[in-house]
Amino acid sequence: FTAGAVWSPAVDAPFLRRFSVSLDYYKIEVTDVVGTIGVPTILASCFNADGSNPGLSNANFYCQQFSRLASGQITGVAQTQVNLASVKTSGIDAQVDWGFDLADLGLPETAGALAFNLVISRLDSFERQARPNAAFVDYAGTIGADLSGGALPEWKSVLSATWAVGPVKTTLRWRHIAAMTDARSVPTFSPTAVNTPDYDVYDLSGSWKIDDRVTLRAGVNNLADQDPPYFTSYPNSNTDPSSFDILGRRVFVGINAKF
């Protein structure tokens, strides 16, 4: 289920005329999830690392997913689409918008206006079963190839601050992703695990509305040229390009024109 609320103060204070807060809570369970099981999980489960095959039977579901020579050497692993039992997740999404004219601080009307926007997400839980009737394992705050979505930070946020003076706007944006634990350390610690630290990226952009038809814009993404965190458990790469900026600092310019 989901529940949400929006609050805008009904007061005539200059600083609160353009202030609003929204909160959304979700708690969702999906059954018979279709996906693939990671190779480390297949091998560990076949050899009973998590209690999945106490008899070490070759007929075990996980053992049937890879082939071996008579010597025991593994020659291939099948990662087919299977029903992965259930996924349960819960969390909170929030957004805060606030804006005011700098004249409210006693500055001249020509000083312009400030506007702030904060979008923040808190992931309370992301529990997954490896197979039907298996125990749920909570992957909230982890990152790794065996997860649906790859990166599951407990906290992530985007904060933007915009200063507008007449036709000119300047925006500074801060993107934050909280530190995460290598999913290979869940539920038991892995000595080869590589965790990721807090990740922060800043973007700077501006625009100039020349008239009702033409607007110029320019900016710099990843202002500090922040490298993505390195970890080894993501498939075919050493980071998660869907979560982290892999291109580094880059400049853009553009023009919007209406005819």
Briefly describe each language-model feature range.
Residues 1, 88-92, 153-157, 198-202, ...:
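Residues that define the transmembrane beta-barrel architecture of outer-membrane proteins
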Residues 3, 17-23, 94, 112-118, ...:
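Transmembrane beta-strands of outer-membrane beta-barrel proteins
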Residues 29-32, 124-127, 173-185, 207-259:
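C-terminal beta-signal and adjacent terminal beta-strands/loops
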Residues 114-209, 224:
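C-terminal beta-barrel architecture of Gram-negative outer-membrane proteins
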